[in-house]
Design a protein with these regions (language model features):
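Short, acidic loop-to-helix structural element flanking the phosphoryl-transfer center
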Residues: 19-35, 83-90, 130-134, 192-206, ...
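Active-site phosphate-binding/coordination module
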Residues: 21-124
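Short active-site oxyanion
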Residues: 36-40, 59-61, 150-151, 213-214, ...
Length: 270
C-alpha cells in the first residue's frame, strides 16, 4: 500500500471536548505511524498549544500551525521551514476597534510569545495560549509590537461569529484570511491573505515529493474547508459544522467524542 500523508485537525476533530487525546486515539496513531504513514497535525493553534499532543502521539513528522502560517519540524532545524506573518498594523488597528467588534480580547500570536489585551483569567482562558497563568510580559502594549505576528486571535461577544468574519473581511478589503476557530468558542483567527491549511499542505507535499492523491484529511470547522477540498480524500467529522460538508468527500459516522478519526484510520489501515 502507498504510504499516505494524513492531515488531522485538533480541536473538534482529534481532541475530545476536554481538549484531550483518548488512549484509543493515541494507540491508533502510533500504529499508523509504525506502518510508515505520515500523520501531520494541521491546526489553527500555535505551536506552544500543540506540542504536547505531538509528543503524546510520538510523532516525528512536520507540523502545521496558525492555520498554515507556520510549517516546521518540531525541535529541529529544518531547511524547509516556512514562517509567514501579517502586517502588525492590522493588530494595532483591531485593538483600536475593540469595542466595534465586541472583542473580549485581542491577541497577537508569535511562534514563542503572545500579547493579549486582557490577560485576565475571567475573560480569557490561559490554556487557550498554552500557559497556566498570564504573566506581565503577555500584556498587550502598542510599543511591544515591534514585529509582525503570525496571526491575530480574538474572542467576540457577537452572536454570529461567521457574520463578523465576513464583515471584517470586507472592512480590511480582503487583505487577511479571517477564519472561525475553536469549536464552540466564539473565536476568530486572522492570518496572512491566501494562507490556509491547504496552502501549507500543498507546500509540504512538494517538499516531500508527494501527490495530493496520497493526502487524507480530517476536520470539523470552517477553517478546514480548503484542506478537505484539496485532499485526495477529505473527511468531515459527524460533529462538523454543516458549512463544511460540501467540501468533504465523506462524513464520518462518529464524532470527536467517539474517537471518529481513530476508528476511520483503523478501518482504512489496520
Amino acid at each position: 500500500m502507498t504510504k499516505k500523508i494524513i492531515a488531522v485537525d485538533l480541536d473538534g476533530t482529534l481532541l475530545n471536548s476536554e481538549s484531550k487525546l483518548s488512549d484509543f486515539t493515541k494507540e491508533t496513531i502510533k500504529k499508523i505511524s509504525e506502518k510508515g504513514h505520515h500523520v501531520i497535525i494541521t491546526t489553527g493553534r500555535p505551536y506552544r498549544m500543540a506540542k504536547d499532543f505531538y509528543r503524546e502521539l510520538e510523532l516525528h513528522t512536520p507540523m502545521i500551525n496558525f492555520n498554515g502560517s507556520l510549517t516546521h519540524l518540531p525541535g529541529q532545524t529544518w531547511e524547509h521551514e516556512r514562517c509567514l506573518t501579517l502586517d502588525k498594523k492590522y493588530l494595532l488597528d483591531m485593538v483600536k476597534r475593540k469595542e466595534d467588534i465586541q472583542a473580549d480580547f485581542i491577541a497577537g500570536e508569535y511562534r514563542k510569545k503572545f500579547y493579549i489585551t486582557a490577560p485576565n483569567e475571567e475573560i480569557a482562558d490561559p490554556k487557550l495560549f498554552g500557559v497556566e497563568n498570564f504573566q506581565p510580559e503577555n500584556q498587550f502594549k502598542p510599543e511591544r509590537v515591534t514585529k509582525n505576528p503570525n496571526c491575530i486571535l480574538l474572542q467576540t461577544r457577537v452572536e454570529d461569529k461567521y457574520a463578523l468574519a465576513d464583515e471584517m473581511n470586507r472592512f480590511y478589503q480582503h487583505q487577511l484570511a479571517i477564519n472561525t476557530w475553536g469549536g464552540p468558542l466564539n473565536i476568530l483567527e486572522c492570518t496572512p491573505k491566501g494562507v490556509n491549511k491547504a496552502f501549507a499542505l500543498e507546500y509540504l507535499l512538494n517538499v516531500m515529493n508527494r501527490d495530493k492523491k496520497d493526502l487524507i484529511a480530517f476536520g470539523d470547522e470552517h477553517n478546514d474547508t480548503e484542506m478537505l477540498a484539496f485532499a485526495g480524500k477529505g473527511y468531515a467529522m459527524k460533529n462538523a459544522n454543516p458549512a463544511l460538508l460540501p467540501y468533504a468527500d465523506e462524513q464520518l459516522p462518529l464524532t470527536n467524542e467517539e474517537d471518529g478519526v481513530a476508528y476511520a484510520l483503523q478501518n482504512l489501515f489496520l
